[in-house]
Amino acid sequence: MGPLMLDVQGCELDAEEREILRHPTVGGVILFGRNYHDRSQLSALVKTIRQAANKPLLIAVDHEGGRVQRFRNGFSRIPPMGILHKARNQATDLATECGWLMAAELLAHDIDLSFAPVLDLERGSNVIGDRSFSSDPEQVIQLASAFIDGMHQAGMKATGKHFPGHGSVRADSHLESPRDNRSWEEIEATDLVPFRELIPAGKLDAIMPAHVIYTELDDQPAGFSRFWLQEVLRGKYGFNGIIFSDDLTMEGAAVAGGYPERAQAALNAGCDMLLACNNRAGAVAILDGLQNPPASRAESLLSTNNGDWSRLTSTSRWKNTQNRVQIFTEEFVN
């Protein structure tokens, strides 16, 4: 499997995209809202992508719930994780049900992965906000662990993001290069706690680092940093799963240079799969510029659950879970 995950422009593939998908460096496709019209169209698009690639291909989407849910009409509405605590003593069970429902519905369309859950603490970052479970690390651990259990029950792997924590910076890494000036001691006592606890518990199959520079510790964003990915994540915390880069076309990645330089820097730091989204020229530059890229280990994230929507929606679990999640969402989401 190649180490580059890229996007496609619309609800159908064009000729250039079919050719790009056959490139040996391409190992995945990330889908967005613009790729979705309805469920039957989505299933047809996914089938066409897999046929065009003619090789194992990881298909992913950001489908966390709340404001980050790419497919809406026809899919269950997943609430933002930041309001699950309102279910009080039922919050943990509700988190499991949300994780299962989200994953099961995507798998029923042959989509392998949702980049979830968010493990960032809610500490004033607008770009994170209610995407976070809580400002309290222990509550994040409890609810994220339950959400992941639901994903795993459905047959989907979990991706924790954004390591080592994006919640304490206000800048949006899509638009600029955020800087976090805190010490190691403060970061380890707060933002790193969910990662530190969930990794040895075997909950996290993949991790996505932040395009944030932690100035007291390294001059590179975490996704380009051997300190963060090799010394801390692999070494200190013993993480053996897949590391995704965040989108290499984001402004927060520009410090590493042009697109091929960004891709090589991420690979050198220890990323297994690179994301290049919303910039066809940038993705093509990476394909042309990467010299003999290593094969990705991300094939382990492919789903073995060949789902079927009609079969899924006829089960009592889907009916009961969908009903409970929708009642909660309608009560607490405007």
Curated annotation (Swiss-Prot):
Site note Important for catalytic activity, residues: D172
Catalytic reaction(s) noted: Hydrolysis of terminal non-reducing N-acetyl-D-hexosamine residues in N-acetyl-beta-D-hexosaminides
GO molecular function, one term: beta-N-acetylhexosaminidase activity
UniProt keywords, alphabetically: Cell cycle, Cell division, Cell shape, Cell wall biogenesis/degradation, Cytoplasm, Glycosidase, Hydrolase, Peptidoglycan synthesis
InterPro entries: Beta_hexosaminidase_bac, Glyco_hydro_3_AS, Glyco_hydro_3_N, Glyco_hydro_3_N_sf, Glycoside_hydrolase_SF, NagZ_Beta-hexosaminidase
Top-rank taxon, per record: Bacteria
GO biological process, one term: cell division
Cellular compartment(s): Cytoplasm
Annotated catalytic residues: H174 (proton donor/acceptor), D246 (nucleophile)
List of residues binding substrate: D62, R70, R131, K161, H162
Gene3D superfamilies: Glycoside hydrolase, family 3, N-terminal domain
EC number(s) recorded for this UniProt protein: 3.2.1.52
Database matches in SUPFAM superfamilies: (Trans)glycosidases
Metabolic or biological pathway, per its Swiss-Prot or TrEMBL entry: Cell wall biogenesis; peptidoglycan recycling
First-tier enzyme category under EC: hydrolase
Family per similarity comment: Belongs to the glycosyl hydrolase 3 family. NagZ subfamily.
Described function: Plays a role in peptidoglycan recycling by cleaving the terminal beta-1,4-linked N-acetylglucosamine (GlcNAc) from peptide-linked peptidoglycan fragments, giving rise to free GlcNAc, anhydro-N-acetylmuramic acid and anhydro-N-acetylmuramic acid-linked peptides.
Protein name: Beta-hexosaminidase
Native source species: Tolumonas auensis (strain DSM 9187 / NBRC 110442 / TA 4)
Organism classification: Bacteria, Pseudomonadati, Pseudomonadota, Gammaproteobacteria, Aeromonadales
